[in-house]
Each structure stands twice: as structure tokens, then as C-alpha cells.
Swiss-Prot record:
One of its GO terms (molecular function) is RNA binding. Residues 154-306 form the TRUD domain. This is tRNA pseudouridine synthase D. Gene3D superfamilies: TruD, catalytic domain, TruD, insertion domain. It holds the Pfam family TruD. One of its GO terms (biological process) is tRNA pseudouridine synthesis.
Length: 350
């Protein structure tokens, strides 16, 4: 199972740049989507971290607060090889407060502490803001045009390479290699590795369907029976008739075309869209059978990713680019449409 063959929206970029040469080349800030109210039994911490993975920092916060690890939550994991500003939640009923400036974890600083009346849960993020410095960029005639095109028309909403892992740092293989063992009948007993392998397998199949849709020339062209995702939530509906209203809603980004996240049961699509999706997944019967047997439900994911508030500027021969993305999407999927990314060997991200 390979991950380097998926189609570009246009052609492969000519420009090349070095990605994440140092942590502050990749700055991520969470966008929570709501404001903590200032009271309640949960303490929300706004933390800047560098060179730390999210789970490790959660452990250190729990130790400092003398609380069980289950009392500390976060909305999403952030790359170890970055400068990240993210929220942590600490369940601490009562009036007692902490001097968070005394949290002595090299690479971490608590910027703000405020109470809220609800637990910070995984998946509540509205999105993330990325500020990325690509170093030693080789210029090309179409670089500015590519950036403008991505800003206007979006990028394929591929799962990024982080989802599939890297076998260089695990002698037993990457997430995708573990997934291959799983579909061939091997039992993965480590719960965390099993979960990552399942996620990688499902993501890989989604990327396959998306890539084939681009290859067929139907990335932006709705098919009869397409499943449309509503912007900003997980709701969707089947469009059996591609009329002017549907086309207008697609143009205004009120809805987007989706592709399947495989699970048990029947595909939600109908007609031409159903025929297309079946034509792709039928080539991977072991994968579909494995995912269905795990009890996962059929779900959908938009095929297009729209970066918002995109800005860029040259800094000598480096390119600084900033944009915001919805939660659950990958900055690398935007970057790959603009230039060839050469990642520095920094080790595993989590």
C-alpha cells in the first residue's frame, strides 16, 4: 500500500521547499469556536508548547495538579515538531486554583487559565490556524498562480502522510504497515497501535476514492446521486438531481461533495456516484471487509478543503504562508498542491 501516487488537482508542482527544518517553521494555533465563560468546574489552559507531544504534556499537567490523568483532556493532538498553542482542560471542581506559572515543563508555557462549565472534549475544535515557513524554495513561474488557485478553488481533502506513520521510527512498521498485517489476519494487541492502524486503513481508502475522482475529471463536477456534506457540520444529504440550486450551493461553499469513510452497511450514494464509488472500492475487497467487520459505520468526508484567510510572502528565498483550516484536515494537503515538500528527518511527530 503506497501513499505517493495520489493525484494532484492540476499537475505536480515544479517548486520545492524544505518543511519543518526547525520547530518554529511550523506554528499551529487552535481555534476553539467558543469562549470559556469564566466559571465552572473545568479549568481551560491555553498553552504554548515546542518540541513536546500533546499526550506527554497532558501527563505533566496532571502530575502538577496532583490529579489522575483522566482529569486532563485536550481537543486534538498537535505535532511534536512545531510551535503549537492549544487548549487543555483540567477537571477541578471547587474554588481551589493553581499557580500555573510554576508548571516547570521545558518547552511549555501556560499563557492563560480560565474556568468553563463544560468539559473540553476531543473533536470540539472549529479549526486550526497554520503559519508555515518553507525554506530554500526553488521559484517557478506558476507558484503564485498555484497559491491563488488553492485559495479560490480549494485543495483535495486528502489525509496527510502523518496519518499513515513512518516505518523509519518503528521497527515493527508504520501505521499503514500494521494495517496491512491486520487485513492479512494478524492480531494487533496494542490498543493504541491497533486504533492507529484502523484509522490509517480507512483514511487510505478515502484517499484512493478521492484520487480516482480527480483522475476521472469529476473533482468539482457533481455526479447524479452524490452525497453532499453541509458546511460546518457532519450532516449530509443525497442529491439525485444536479440542478441549478445544487450548483449554486456548491459554488458558495454551502455544501461540498463527499466520499466514503468505509464501514458496515450500504453506501449512502446513489446512481452515477454510487457506481463510481463501487468501481474504486471493489478493487480493495480485503480492506472493505476488514473495516466492516470492525463495526465501523459508513460515514462521509468532504473531498475539497478550503483554506481561509490565506496570506503569503517571500522572506529572501523562503516562503511564509498562513491559512486556517477546519478541524480534522491537514496543512500538508494544501502545501502539496503548491510545491513539493521536502521534510527534514525529525523523527516521529507524536
Amino acid at each position: 500500500m503506497q501513499i505517493n501516487h495520489w493525484q494532484y488537482l492540476s499537475s505536480k508542482p515544479e517548486s520545492t521547499g524544505i518543511f519543518k527544518q526547525q520547530p518554529d517553521d511550523f506554528v499551529v494555533q487552535e481555534i476553539l469556536g467558543y469562549e470559556p465563560v469564566g466559571e465552572g468546574e473545568h479549568i481551560y489552559l491555553w498553552v504554548r508548547k515546542e518540541g513536546l507531544n500533546t499526550a506527554y504534556l497532558a501527563e505533566q499537567i496532571a502530575k502538577f495538579a496532583q490529579l489522575p490523568l483522566r482529569a486532563v483532556t485536550y481537543a486534538g493532538r498537535k505535532d511534536k515538531h512545531s510551535v503549537s498553542e492549544q487548549w487543555f482542560g483540567v477537571h477541578k471542581p471547587g474554588k481551589a486554583e493553581y499557580d500555573w506559572s510554576a508548571l516547570n515543563v521545558p518547552g511549555a508555557t501556560v499563557l492563560k487559565a480560565i474556568r468553563h462549565n463544560k468539559k473540553l472534549r476531543t473533536g470540539v475544535l472549529k479549526g486550526n490556524k497554520f503559519t508555515i515557513l518553507m525554506r530554500d524554495v526553488t521559484p517557478s513561474d506558476d507558484l503564485a498562480q498555484r497559491i491563488a488557485q488553492v485559495s479560490l478553488s480549494g485543495a483535495p481533502n486528502y489525509y496527510g502522510p502523518q496519518r499513515f506513520g513512518d516505518s523509519r521510527y518503528d521497527p515493527k512498521g508504520s501505521n499503514l504497515m500494521l494495517a496491512e498485517k491486520m487485513i492479512n489476519g494478524e492480531v494487533i494487541r496494542n490498543r493504541n497501535k491497533r486504533s492507529m492502524a484502523i484509522s490509517a486503513l480507512r483514511s487510505w481508502l478515502f484517499n484512493e476514492v478521492l484520487s480516482e475522482r480527480i483522475n476521472a475529471g469529476d473533482f468539482a463536477q457533481p455526479l447524479e446521486g452524490d452525497v453532499m456534506s453541509l458546511a460546518g457540520n457532519a450532516s449530509y444529504f443525497v442529491s439525485d438531481d444536479i440542478d441549478d440550486t445544487i450548483k449554486q450551493r456548491l459554488a458558495t461553499r454551502d455544501i461540498t461533495i463527499s466520499a466514503p469513510l468505509w464501514g458496515k452497511g450500504e453506501l449512502a450514494s446513489t446512481g452515477s456516484a454510487l457506481a463510481f464509488e463501487k468501481s474504486v472500492v471493489m478493487n480493495h475487497p480485503k480492506i472493505t471487509k476488514t473495516l466492516a467487520s470492525l463495526g465501523l459505520e459508513q460515514e462521509r468526508r468532504p473531498i475539497v478543503l478550503y483554506p481561509s484567510n490565506l496570506t503569503w510572502a517571500w522572506e529572501q528565498n523562503n516562503l511564509r504562508i498562513a491559512f486556517e483550516l477546519p478541524a480534522g484536515t491537514f496543512a500538508t494537503s494544501v502545501l502539496r498542491e503548491i510545491l513539493n515538500v521536502e521534510s527534514v528527518d525529525t523523527g516521529p511527530s507524536e
